[in-house]
Amino acid sequence: MKPLNIIFAGTPDFAARHLQALLNSHHNVIGVYTQPDRPAGRGKKLTASPVKELAVGNNIPVYQPGSLRKEPAQQELAALNADIMVVVAYGLILPKVVLNTPRLGCINVHGSILPRWRGAAPIQRALWAGDKETGVTVMQMDVGLDTGDMLLKTTLPIEDSDTSASLYEKLAEQGPVALLQALEGLANGTLAAEKQDEALANYAEKLSKEEARLDWNKSAQQLWQEVRAFNPWPVSYFEHQGNTIKVWQTQVSETTSTAAPGTIISASKKGIEVATADGVLTLLNMQLPGKKPLNVADILNARGEWFSPNTRLANEAQ
C-alpha cells in the first residue's frame, strides 16, 4: 500500500496515542493540528497539549488556529496537499470546506459503537447507562456531530470492574489499531461505508460535577453504574457531617431493606451498606476532604462515628 500523506488533528492523550500509531506506521504525517496552548496547573502557565508535545518531539509542523472557519486557516491547511485528515478528540468544529479539502476527506475515531453515544462523553455514558459493550467507530466525517458514514467498527465487552479510566485505556489501545485498518481499506478501496441508523442514535452529554452527587432515591444498580462512570472525573460524592465525601468504588449488595433511601444499614470493614430507592448499595472506597481515597475499613477507623447504622446520609431530594 502506498503511504498516505496525513494531516492529524487532536488534542488530549487519547488523540496522542493515535498520532503515535501513525508515526510508527509507513504513512507520512505532514502536519498536526491541535488546540491552542491553555493555562494549566496552579501557576496557570500556558501548557501544550499532549498531541503538540508529541508532534514537536518528532519535528512535525504544528498548527494551532483558534478556529478553522476563517479563510487564512483554511488556505494554510489546503496548502499541505494532504491525502486525508485524521481527527481524534480535536475539539474544534470542521466546516464543510475543510472536510472536503483532503483528497480522501476527513475521518474520525470515536469511542463508541455508533450511532449510540454520539457526542462528548461516549465512554462515560456507556457505563452510566449500564451498556454491556462499547467499542470504536472510524467514520467519514460530515458536518453533523458524529453523524458520518461508518467505515469500521470494533467492539469490547464492558466488565463489572470497568470504570471510565479502565475503558479509556482499553479504547486507547483499540482505537489506533482500528484507525490503521481503516486507512489501509481506504487506500485500497476495499472499505464499504455504512450509513448510521438515525432511529438508534443518542447523545453522550458532557459530565458535570452536579450530576455526580449521589441521589439515594435512585436504584442501587444505577448508582453503581454512575460511580464507575464518574471515576476518575468528576467522582461521585455525597454530603455528610458538613463534608463532601467522594465515592470511588461500590457494589450492589444482596442485602434487602425497607429503610428510607440514604439510611445506613450496616458498617463494617467489608463496606458501608446504604439503602436506596431499590436495593442496597455497598460503599467500598471513599475519600474524606483533604485526604486520599481509602478502603472503608480505614475510613471507619478514622471516622466510624459518622457512619453508625440508622444514620441518614444527606440526599439532594430531602
From Swiss-Prot:
Question: Which GO molecular function terms does the record list?
Answer: methionyl-tRNA formyltransferase activity
Q: Which GO terms describe its cellular component?
A: cytosol
Fetch the HAMAP family from UniProt.
Formyl_trans
Give the catalysed reaction(s), semicolon-separated: L-methionyl-tRNA(fMet) + (6R)-10-formyltetrahydrofolate = N-formyl-L-methionyl-tRNA(fMet) + (6S)-5,6,7,8-tetrahydrofolate + H(+)
Q: Which family does it belong to?
A: Belongs to the Fmt family.
The source organism is Shewanella baltica (strain OS185)
Q: What is its EC number?
A: 2.1.2.9
Q: What does this protein do?
A: Attaches a formyl group to the free amino group of methionyl-tRNA(fMet). The formyl group appears to play a dual role in the initiator identity of N-formylmethionyl-tRNA by promoting its recognition by IF2 and preventing the misappropriation of this tRNA by the elongation apparatus.
Binding residue positions for (6S)-5,6,7,8-tetrahydrofolate: S112, I113, L114, P115
Q: State if Protein biosynthesis is listed as a keyword.
A: yes
| Keyword Transferase applies | yes
List cystine links.
Answer: none
- Protein name as catalogued: Methionyl-tRNA formyltransferase
- Give the keywords, sorted: Protein biosynthesis, Transferase
* InterPro entries, per database record: Fmt (IPR005794), Formyl_trans_C (IPR005793), Formyl_trans_C_sf (IPR037022), Formyl_transf_N (IPR002376), Formyl_transf_N_sf (IPR036477), Formyl_transferase-like_C_sf (IPR011034), GART_AS (IPR001555), Met-tRNA-FMT_C (IPR044135)
